Amino acid sequence: MTKRSNLDSNHIIYRSEELLGAASNRYNITVRVAKRAKENRSEDFDSIDDPNMKPAIRAIIEMSDELTRPEIISDN
């Protein structure tokens, strides 16, 4: 039996579209999500929050939550 995360795939798609829509450059935001996912994977290797959540999904959720802070999406 496979365990399913309690996250809805449509919700993840909505969050990623929201994140991409707010970004001025789709490539840069994609790279930033990938870097955040890589950091999450190395830092939270044995995380007890939700071990079934993939690092990329966690990064998308975190970054879409941080949309209120423009420095996350601005081109530095």
Curated annotation (Swiss-Prot):
Q: Which family does it belong to?
A: Belongs to the RNA polymerase subunit omega family.
Q: What protein name is recorded for this chain? A: DNA-directed RNA polymerase subunit omega
Q: What is its EC number?
A: 2.7.7.6
Alphabetical UniProt keywords: DNA-directed RNA polymerase, Nucleotidyltransferase, Transcription, Transferase
Catalyzed reactions:
RNA(n) + a ribonucleoside 5'-triphosphate = RNA(n+1) + diphosphate
Entries under Pfam families matching the protein: RNA_pol_Rpb6
- Its EC top class is transferase
Name the InterPro entries on file.
Answer: DNA-dir_RNA_pol_omega, Pol_omega/Rpo6/RPB6, RPB6/omega-like_sf
MF-aspect GO terms: DNA binding; DNA-directed RNA polymerase activity
Q: What does this protein do?
A: Promotes RNA polymerase assembly. Latches the N- and C-terminal regions of the beta' subunit thereby facilitating its interaction with the beta and alpha subunits.
- Which gene does this sequence derive from? rpoZ
**Complex formation:** In cyanobacteria the RNAP catalytic core is composed of 2 alpha, 1 beta, 1 beta', 1 gamma and 1 omega subunit. When a sigma factor is associated with the core the holoenzyme is formed, which can initiate transcription.
* Signal peptide region: none
| Entry keyword Transcription | yes
What GO cellular component entries does it have? DNA-directed RNA polymerase complex
The Gene Ontology biological process annotation of the record reads:
DNA-templated transcription
